[in-house]
Amino acid sequence: MATAAWLLGRRVASWRMRPPLQSLAGLITQRTNSLLPVDDAVNGLNEEQKQLRQTVAKFLQEHLAPQAQEIDQSNEFKNLREFWKQLGNLGVLGITAPVQYGGSGLGFLENVLVMEEISRVSGAVGLSYGAHSNLCINQIVRNGNETQKEKYLPKLISGEYIGALAMSEPNAGSDVVSMKLKAEKKGDHYVLNGNKFWITNGPDADVLVVYAKTDVTAVPASRGITAFIVEKGMPGFSTSKKLDKLGMRGSNTCELVFEDCEVPAANILGHLGKGVYVLMSGLDLERLVLAGGPLGIMQAVLDHTIPYLHMREAFGQKIGHFQLMQGKMADMYTRLMACRQYVYNVAKACDEGHCTTKDCAGVILYSAECATQVALDGIQCLGGNGYINDFPMGRFLRDAKLYEIGAGTSEVRRLVIGRAFNADFH
């Protein structure tokens, strides 16, 4: 009688001799090179905005899509610098920056659209783009003096430099005002000592906006915070080994270390002791622009799931024809479209000068949680294929989860919204 081990060995050998599953390989190739159409007439975009999406999407399919899965698996974007310069040539790195510094002079809606399309191809590269274009460049645009803008913006906008923002610390995440990084005045410099943690683009950044305590006795503590522009290579500034993250792999993140790091007083961004105003006003726009990330991830889930449901067969028909699968398609699509309308409308309002803290928190709260659910639904639709790494569904889920944590957790966003309503009744 054949033993169980012998039978298992026969089955394994037989399986290994089979040719690759054509439906699986074919679908992966198909999804790499084509996207579902996005109806921007429904989304309320003008012709220039529609063209922007199409141009960016076409560029990304050629220059980023073929690498997206490898970037995630290796946790490394090998040609990051080259790609960044290509984004600079495309004109999207300084999309909200004035033309005089090499920017495109467009609005936050356009920034969201680019963030969405990059995240549609790679959530990790989208996150790095958001940190560069909004957290770094836009902060210098909004708060820098003319000398600072002329010095830093052109190279950040061209892609020669990579930018970052450093706010969080190991024990100061949501409670960011409790930061411990200290900046002590000595002559015409400030000497920084301490560290920052979870810093997106940290290992790669040439220019960083860094928040530090210049007055540890200030009451309230927020009045003692100042923003600085720090350059890679400044003596006393170093980066630790990049972190091995659950998702957003290839968007390099690390700890920043400051050991008697001398930063010129001329590099104060905004005004001494007014860093909290730079921080909080920038945080609203950070949350808005980063909300484009979950939109892109949700669209990517649909890009892969909808065609699969109309190719895979079970019980003699395409599984997309089963009512339960139709329900999932409807749920995923309506979540995406509801999020899009909210994000786009808040972006339009900000472009018109009406930017509210509760809605900037609201757009990323809702879109982030919807993205996680849509990614879970996508995995369920693909069944076993959704759970193997030949398909990118697991990547979408891991990337989506970051947006419930970064730029303020979902819990903090709910507090922000609730407090805004409470303030109306004081």
Curated annotation (Swiss-Prot):
Gene3D superfamilies: Acyl-CoA dehydrogenase/oxidase, N-terminal domain, Butyryl-CoA Dehydrogenase, subunit A, domain 2, Butyryl-CoA Dehydrogenase, subunit A, domain 3
Alphabetical GO biological process terms: branched-chain amino acid catabolic process; L-leucine catabolic process
Top class in the EC scheme: oxidoreductase
Principal location class: mitochondrion
A Pfam match: Acyl-CoA_dh_N
Gene name of the record: IVD
Name of the protein described by the UniProt record: Isovaleryl-CoA dehydrogenase, mitochondrial
Annotated EC: 1.3.8.4, 1.3.8.1
